[in-house]
């Protein structure tokens, strides 16, 4: 009996731990992870910028393909390079809140979570002059209070369901292979244009992989959209974007 109870408790703890980090988990609050119905839309998202020079180089790749993406920016980097954040919005992309310091929020108290989100919101407002209403938790880590606080601040939680596992700067071939292995229409792709540990992380391979992935999937009839556009395709009341291509 005791063995059964201990095993059940351990399984419960394991499940809770998994759900706190799993990008598609919904136990701790609803988050957008892609379209549930068949679609030819794909959404590229980039975390941990702005980053010099790789965010700017990535903007060149996206412009060459006439593709718009969503960038979840770290507030302290926005403070350091507001000009790059402005270039992202100027190019027609959407920006979102990725906290100010990139902490793992499951270990932060509610006041700390609010401080992180507000500081990033302030940095984005100072840089681009508009209110941002998309939020992605660092590492995907969250608990119920995280999404509750975000929504109280008018932020919509955004996760992903496909990743290129590019945070350790693998080869472009590795990134492309990881994405292609998982990708289906309606998916949200997580990549990185910066690194949370330090400004200036090498993301050249992510830019190369993005170039190849866009070419490949455009040739197969897919279209790339911002998160806001994708949410609009699946709901009657999508969130208002900061940046994005004008109608």
Regions flagged by a language model, labelled:
Residues 1-20:
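Hydrophobic alpha-helical topogenic segments used for membrane insertion/localization
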């Amino acid at each position: 009996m005791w063995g059964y109870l201990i095993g059940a408790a351990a399984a419960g703890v394991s499940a809770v731990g998994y759900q706190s980090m799993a990008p598609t988990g919904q136990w701790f609050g609803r988050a957008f992870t892609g379209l549930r119905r068949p679609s030819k839309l794909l959404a590229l998202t980039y975390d941990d910028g702005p980053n010099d020079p790789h965010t700017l180089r990535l903007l060149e790749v996206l412009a060459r393909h006439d593709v718009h993406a969503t960038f979840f920016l770290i507030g302290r980097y926005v403070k350091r390079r507001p000009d790059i954040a402005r270039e992202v919005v100027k190019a027609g992309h959407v920006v979102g809140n990725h906290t100010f310091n990139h902490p793992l929020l499951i270990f932060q108290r509610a006041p700390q979570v609010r401080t992180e989100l507000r500081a990033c919101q302030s940095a984005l407002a100072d840089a681009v002059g508009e209110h941002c209403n998309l939020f992605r938790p660092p590492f995907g880590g969250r608990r119920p209070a995280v999404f509750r606080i975000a929504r109280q601040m008018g932020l919509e939680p955004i996760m992903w369901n496909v990743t290129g596992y590019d945070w350790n700067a693998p080869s472009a071939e590795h990134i492309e292979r990881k994405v292609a292995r998982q990708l289906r229409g309606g998916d949200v792709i997580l990549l990185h244009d910066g690194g949370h540990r330090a400004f200036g992380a090498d993301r050249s391979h992510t830019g190369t992989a993005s170039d190849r992935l866009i070419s490949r999937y455009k040739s197969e009839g897919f279209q790339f959209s911002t998160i806001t556009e994708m949410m609009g395709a699946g709901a009657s009341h999508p969130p208002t974007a900061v940046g994005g291509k004008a109608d």
